[in-house]
Amino acid sequence: MKITNAAFVRSVSDLSDLPEESFPEIVFAGRSNVGKSSLLNSLTGRKGLAKTSSTPGKTRLINYFLLNDNLYFVDIPGYGYAAVSHAEKDAWGRLLAGYVGDRAAIALVVLLLDSRHPAMKSDRDMMDFLAYHDRPYGIVLTKDDKLTQKERTHAKRATESCAMNAGFIVSYSSVSGKGKNELLDHFDRYL
């Protein structure tokens, strides 16, 4: 897959505001502050396309980006962030369950795991949720540049042991771009 253009389309806080299902959607999911926005910016080559923050929980809406005029990248709120109210967590949970569970246009869910803390309980719960809804998914181990080779090997093995249904596992660095071409090649298989 080659990305020639990318643009922000809209943010959605209610399922009734989702765009028409006219293009396939690749959804980016993961814990808060795992690097979803950085990954989107790295993949598209557009540094400020998705807003990044060092503060967890900044993405609170479903954000749509149109790529090549025929594909959506969708950035969804991170899970596992403790500093929001229970009511807000419940609202996010209902929004995401409705979106991921029912949206026919979803071609692939890309589950991002911090390679320094792979396969935490919340990540395993998300894998179970995706399997329950029969959603194809792949895993991206983010922040690869922060690990030694030994730590990378351990992170990949730990992830493989609990991600039996994942279509792929890619180690990725948004800083260096390591893993970018491999990940884009995987996307082609689902479109």
From Swiss-Prot:
Source species, domain of life: Bacteria
Keywords: Cell cycle, Cell division, GTP-binding, Magnesium, Metal-binding, Nucleotide-binding, Septation
The keyword Nucleotide-binding is assigned to this record: yes
Family label: Belongs to the TRAFAC class TrmE-Era-EngA-EngB-Septin-like GTPase superfamily. EngB GTPase family.
Organism (species): Chlorobium phaeovibrioides (strain DSM 265 / 1930) (Prosthecochloris vibrioformis (strain DSM 265))
Signal sequence extent: none
One GO CC annotation: cytosol
CDD domains in the record: YihA_EngB (cd01876)
Domain EngB-type G: 22-191
Cofactor names: Mg(2+)
Biological process according to GO: division septum assembly
Gene3D superfamilies cross-referenced by the UniProt entry: P-loop containing nucleotide triphosphate hydrolases
A Pfam short name: MMR_HSR1
Protein name (database record): Probable GTP-binding protein EngB
Record-listed Mg(2+) binding positions: 37, 59
NCBIfam families found in the cross-reference section: GTPase_YsxC
Molecular function as annotated in GO: GTP binding; metal ion binding
